[in-house]
Amino acid sequence: MKRITVLLVAAIAAIAVVAATQAGAASSGTAGLTNPKHFFWGAGQAPASDPTTSLQNDLIYHGGSGGPGAIGVQTKPAVYLVYWGTEWAQGFTTADSDGKLYSSKTLQNYVNSFVGNVGGSPYAGIQTQYCNGVLPGSTSCVGGTGFVTNPKRQLKGVWTDPTPVPSDIVALGLAENLVDDPIAMEAQRASGHFGYDPNATYVIITPPTEIATGQPVYCGYHTQTTSIDGLGNPFRLEYAFIPWQNTNWPGLGQGCGFHNVNAKSNSFGNGVFDSWSIVIGHEYAEAVTDPDNFVSFQDGWNDDQTSENGDKCAWINTQNIALGGHQFAVQPLWSNEAFDATGNGCVVSR
């Protein structure tokens, strides 16, 4: 998610104040630091495209040295899904554009199936060209070590946390500039629930609200909280926030991918839930290849405009891919290898 420092309107300015001290990890209770968010902007809100020369378009490795505990890339990616809120525990329905109702269980099955089958796929294989063992400024991993791998079954756990989502998220969508960031704190609770994994992304998903969190400014983000464990060792907790995607105001759903690929919905959720696989796929890919962000320094793979592998292909040629016997809407991901060979860096397989 490209970090935006030049803000578009005053409302976005309130959301973009992102460095804050907060409560620490659930395992230790010590203080932590929430680092700047990498936002995925809705269609039509993305920054201008990058220049077209090869050097300026390739992702560049930034050294993996962004503070204590930095890893550069996730070499063995893992994902934990957290459905946070009483609504998920109780169940609810959401309406498609034609009024047809879909259950929250159907949505959860769609998301779980996507994340549960992306590991080992050609789509996730795009990331295996990147590593953490090359010099800063490198645009390839020739001679590198610490490559991103593509294991199957990257979904390591699913948790429905029935505790209520705080009202400052539900009503305002400004949690990310509060002293005690509730999203980061929920990620820390998830780490306590599942166990800590430096190669994992903890994905926090909130239920529908009258005013969707953070929307219509952005569709999601990934970031990390830097904390201290019980032995005094610094560690990074990588997490992504996926607010409710299907709220229909003002044009929100289409802005984040509602029916972006599939005009008609089916019983599995294609169409009505297109946005969920597009946005989660975007955040997952960026968290794997550019996980560190210590005090605004992105030390993984991003280009000279700080755009990551998802940003560079956002809303370009979105399409279905087959995973686990189902179709899922996704955006392409950036491939240095493909760009250098063909001039087209936005691909859906490797």
Segments the model singles out, each with a brief description of its role:
Residues 1-8:
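Bacterial N-terminal signal peptides that target proteins for export
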Residues 9-18:
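Bacterial N-terminal signal peptides
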Residues 19-25:
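Sec/Tat signal peptide C-region and signal peptidase I cleavage site
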Residues 27-174, 178, 182:
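N-terminal carbohydrate-binding/catalytic regions of secreted carbohydrate-active enzymes
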Residues 75-80, 123, 197-202, 235-238, ...:
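Loop/turn elements at helix/coil->beta-strand transitions in domains of secreted/extracellular proteins
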Residues 142-229:
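Active-site-proximal segments of metallohydrolase catalytic domains
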Residues 217-274, 290-350:
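Metalloprotease/metallohydrolase-associated module, dominated by Zn2+-dependent proteases
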Residues 278-290:
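Active-site recognition of the HExxH zinc-binding catalytic motif
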